[in-house]
Amino acid sequence: VDRFIGKLDRGESMCHQMIMGAGKTTVVAPLLALLLADGKTLTMQVVPHALLEMSRNVMREKFSAVIRKPVFTFYFDRFMKIDSALYSKIKKSREMKAVVVASPTSVKSFILKFVEQAKNLEKEKEAGTGGAKKGMLGGLGFMRDKMSKVIGKKKFNEVSMGEAYYCTETLKIFRSGVLLLDEVDLLLHPLKSELNW
């Protein structure tokens, strides 16, 4: 735990291997969460989907008696909207010194949603300025009109801008936070951890 804290103070990442049953999930992760969730830094624990329930229960068990600390679950998929409610929850989690438990799929989906939002805004900008009129993306002008009808009075780009803003603000909290990866060999495996959208 001291080594992890020392590396964090120097702004470095660290990967530490421990044998099975040595207390990675039940001792080290809760201790790090206790020390790192200080109200200024979001502490997020990412575990494989199969271990999500168990890891969340371990955290809740550790932080429900003597030392009380909220434990929340971050769930996100590509069809969810990024709005002020999601941003407020993440911000409140940081302020409450909570531990946020998530699966790698949720974190990757959020990052891909950010990329998608940036791409949509770029397309909208090109369509609005008259650029990129050719090819498959050239029809964005009529897509924008259709989306405006679906949304109603709000313009498509206003909705996209709002979503992109909250996406960026949430990502800032993530980037200034700490990510605890449990079972890192599974989470970062190039063949087993891919997320196809």
What spans do the regions from the language model cover?
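N-terminal pre-P-loop "Q-motif" helix
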Residues: 1-10
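Walker A/P-loop
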Residues: 9-31
